[in-house]
């Protein structure tokens, strides 16, 4: 390989090498794993081939080569905290990989590794700097490395079970407690004796001298529940090599952040931030994080407060904080997108295509965080005052930074670590308990056996052109996820047929309903899903009994099929209309298509206006009224992309795809383009006119940068329009105006109500001021300090602050506690003179009150507020407060 060894050149060389070895190049999969709830993000090259290795998803090739986008931040695999402090940790990295699905095995797998690394035609790495590890009992791999490749035996290291259990080793890979597994061999590069560190398997192995660059897994066993290992009929190979690590070797540097790609990004960051010292760790953080952030947004993740979106938010905010540390006083991070596109946009065109979307999302998040960053940093500085190296920051302070100022706890930890201070994580977790409980509740799913049912034979779907099929065979039955020979009346279970007209849930469309009848019984199908290549029918036996291998008749409920098809086709027209009205930056984030309603989620950073909704709805209905054919064609994925077909979010496609084309669109380059052209395996109408009419029923935000439109079609749309008309007529009657005048009358009434509310607020403030004048008579002296505790009826949280300011001016060196009582809600406020805060703090008073009353609150030492529902014990709690304050004052 010719100099210079740029990262991009090495990536391409790897792919070219394996293409020359008859491997099929496969594009990187999305960072959002497809149908794998065990993963937060794609973190290895083999993720997209998992079902292929399990034998559930056949491919039309047996050898593959990829350069896979990977993220390790959040969840089990999390490198975020170490980025910027080590030479090789990243949130985003590229994994070069070659794969064999029952094709070549150890001999060729090891041979390819050695040839690519050491031959003069490719990387030409010094052979004497390479060491390998193998699993302790893998004599076959040892012989290949030693006898065939020629590596001295002293440079081949056997690694045994070093993780406390049989086959638990750094050199034995498993997919889970059961399933495919096997030994692996790893290649290490020796950076030289001037760097500390020992060989793999030694106590000094964590040093930086010997660095793993390539891992090759030989999947040759199938682990059983009892722990025994059975040989796989078709052994496979899964390898991975980090592009950043091999680039460091080829460029003669030791750390990943010294390679060309990072140097260019760090130079760009230094220029944007106008700093000269480019050796700062914060620049490494910014250079690393812009990669993870940009690729995540390009793959459809948006900043939010949960799941993947929250991890993205944490990464952005960590980068912004490091920019702030380097002197940034305005939004800067979004400006890093352009340098990244210049570096990686050719290899990953999605960066170019989504550049403006990425920049806008980052800038919006920066702007939002800037509102609280300075305040949060001041609070943290105050909390850290007096703490020294080795001390602990309270979990309560860390939680307040998270809850009030949007500081993820790892961002706070990042800052405290720079001063040698740790966070009381146990206390932080206590404060987070309520949020964690809510998150767990939100993450629960109904029982779904599709992931545990393993069916050998694929099901043939025949439902595109028919609703029923006679003479199908029941291949398998399941109850509670376990195989069964029969199901009797009243039993719920799952049926697998050899062929079926039932459409399985996919592409946003719900599974179909209907009946499966045999000579001995009737099974009511209540849902249909996929399990690998099989289609499984959920339901209940409503009559008689059903047995395996019986012949049956399968019939889909026709009315449900027709209504679902209308909604599914309408969803495609809606998607196209959204992009025409709101712009091409709109991308689908999810959908639900049932017989009753359609729901479409899409990326857009602001509410869709009423005028835009009207235009979108009109565009769709114009296409429906045109009554053009809905044309379905099967073609290669490459041909579909050439024709401009769009792919649905979250779907994975094979080499041949089904393309749905509908409507007539604009003329481009002299040719009339279709209104909508998308890849879709779902069920659709024959002509757009079959949809009847579409009516948008709601538009809302469901997460940061994600909007949702719900709509109905056909008779459901007619019913919706009629209901709206009836409601409008009733309103007009109540308001005693004509229907066209309803909106203006409502606006007039709203204006009048706002004016009345302002008058009421002014009146309440006057009442509060009048009450304040009388409160001074209630002041008591506790431990030499004036203390005023008073409950005020008709006062809410807004008025209580004004009242407090009035009283403070009359009682300067005192403790004041006010409880406003209005509409069965208590507004709590406490003020403590600065001269007294060393003994009692306002925040402590409010937290005590809130805790006793079942509310919440807090604040600063000199002023705090809270709230609580009025309870039976309110008077008792308030009456006991003087004694509690006396204890604090000593």
UniProtKB/Swiss-Prot annotation:
Substrates-to-products reaction catalysed: tRNA(Ala) + L-alanine + ATP = L-alanyl-tRNA(Ala) + AMP + diphosphate
Residues given in the record as Zn(2+) binding sites: 568, 572, 680, 684
A single cellular component GO annotation: cytosol
UniProt cofactor note: Binds 1 zinc ion per subunit.
UniProt keyword Signal present: no
Top-level taxon: Bacteria
SUPFAM superfamilies registered for this protein in UniProt: Class II aaRS and biotin synthetases, Putative anticodon-binding domain of alanyl-tRNA synthetase (AlaRS), ThrRS/AlaRS common domain, Translation proteins
Cross-referenced Gene3D superfamilies: 2.40.30.130, 3.10.310.40, 3.30.54.20, 6.10.250.550, Bira Bifunctional Protein, Domain 2, Threonyl-trna Synthetase, Chain A, domain 2
Keywords, alphabetical: Aminoacyl-tRNA synthetase, ATP-binding, Cytoplasm, Ligase, Metal-binding, Nucleotide-binding, Protein biosynthesis, RNA-binding, tRNA-binding, Zinc
The EC number(s) this enzyme carries: 6.1.1.7
Molecular function via GO: alanine-tRNA ligase activity; aminoacyl-tRNA deacylase activity; ATP binding; tRNA binding; zinc ion binding
Pfam families in the cross-refs: DHHA1 (PF02272), tRNA-synt_2c (PF01411), tRNA_SAD (PF07973)
Cofactors: Zn(2+)
Entry keyword annotation includes Ligase: yes
One GO term of the biological process aspect: alanyl-tRNA aminoacylation
Domain notes: Consists of three domains; the N-terminal catalytic domain, the editing domain and the C-terminal C-Ala domain. The editing domain removes incorrectly charged amino acids, while the C-Ala domain, along with tRNA(Ala), serves as a bridge to cooperatively bring together the editing and aminoacylation centers thus stimulating deacylation of misacylated tRNAs.
Described purpose of this protein according to its UniProt entry: Catalyzes the attachment of alanine to tRNA(Ala) in a two-step reaction: alanine is first activated by ATP to form Ala-AMP and then transferred to the acceptor end of tRNA(Ala). Also edits incorrectly charged Ser-tRNA(Ala) and Gly-tRNA(Ala) via its editing domain.
Family, similarity comment: Belongs to the class-II aminoacyl-tRNA synthetase family.
Protein name: Alanine--tRNA ligase
Organism name: Psychrobacter cryohalolentis (strain ATCC BAA-1226 / DSM 17306 / VKM B-2378 / K5)
